[in-house]
Amino acid sequence: MGAPLVALNDGNSIPQVGLGVWQTPPEDTERAVAAALAAGYRHVDTAAAYGNEEQTGRAIAQSGLDRSQVYLVTKLWNSEQGYDATLAAFEASVDRLGVDYLDLYLIHWPVPEKNLFVDTFRAFARLREDGRIRSIGVSNFEPEHLRVLIDSTGIVPAVNQIELHPLLPQRELRELHAQLGIATEAWSPLGQGSLLAHPTVTGVAESHGKTAAQALIRWHMQLGNIVIPKSVNPQRIESNFDVFDFELSEQDMASISSLEDASRLGPDPKTFNFTG
C-alpha cells in the first residue's frame, strides 16, 4: 500500500510519508534509499548540506523505477542564498542527483542576518516557471519570515518543513499554515529517538500492536503533517512505512500530544545564521 497523497497549493501533491536522509553518511545513503524504495516509499528528502545527494540520486536511478514515480526533494544551503547564487546551486544539486528536475526545492533556513531569502525565493519561482522545479517551498521559516516572503513575492510556499514532534507540536505555526494553504512537513518527527521509550508512546503503540515509531508517525499523519522519518536500518525503514492499516483514537492522539514541553532539538530559526 502506498502513502496517501497530500494536496499542495499549486495543484501538485506529495506522498505523506517519505524517507529523510539527514545525518545519513554517504556510504549508507544509497543502501537506505534503495531499501526505502523497495519497501514502497516514493518520497525521498535530502539536502545539499547533507553531502549525500549523489548517493540519493544513484539509488533512485538504480531502483528500476521511473523518475516520475519518485518524489524527490532537496534544499538550498544557507551560503548559497541570493538570486544568482541560487540558480547556480540548483544546477549543482540536480547535477549531483543526476536528474533534470526536482519535485520540491526548499530554502533550508531563513538566515535572517543575511536577509536574502526573498531574492532566493524569486530565483525558485523562475526555476519553477522554467519547468525545473514542480513545487517551491521553505524550511524552518517562522511566521515573520513567511509574512515577509509572501508580501514581497506574492507567492505562498507550497511546504514549510519544520522541527515538529510531540514535544514541539508547533500548534500556532500549523494553524498559520492552514490559514495560508501551506503544507506542514515535520523533520525529526520522532524527536530524534527521545520519545521511543516514553511510556505514553509505548502504551499507545502496544494497544495497536505497533512500534513506538509507528505510533508517532501515525500521530503526525492524523494531524495532517507530511513526515520523513530517518533510518539506515532496512527493517526499521520498512517498519516505518507500515503505518496505513491502523488509526489512533482521539484519546491516543491527546495522550501523545500531552507530552508537549516546547523542547527544541535543533537551532532556533530566529537566530540561526550559520553559513559554513
From Swiss-Prot:
The keyword NADP applies. The keyword NADP applies. NADPH binds at residues 190, 228, 230-232, 236, 239-240. Keywords: NADP, Oxidoreductase. The active site is at residue 50. InterPro entries: AKR, Aldo/ket_reductase_CS, NADP_OxRdtase_dom, NADP_OxRdtase_dom_sf. Signal peptide: none annotated. Its EC number is 1.1.1.-. One of its GO terms (molecular function) is aldo-keto reductase (NADPH) activity. Belongs to the aldo/keto reductase family. This is Aldo-keto reductase Mjls_1919. It comes from Mycobacterium sp. (strain JLS).
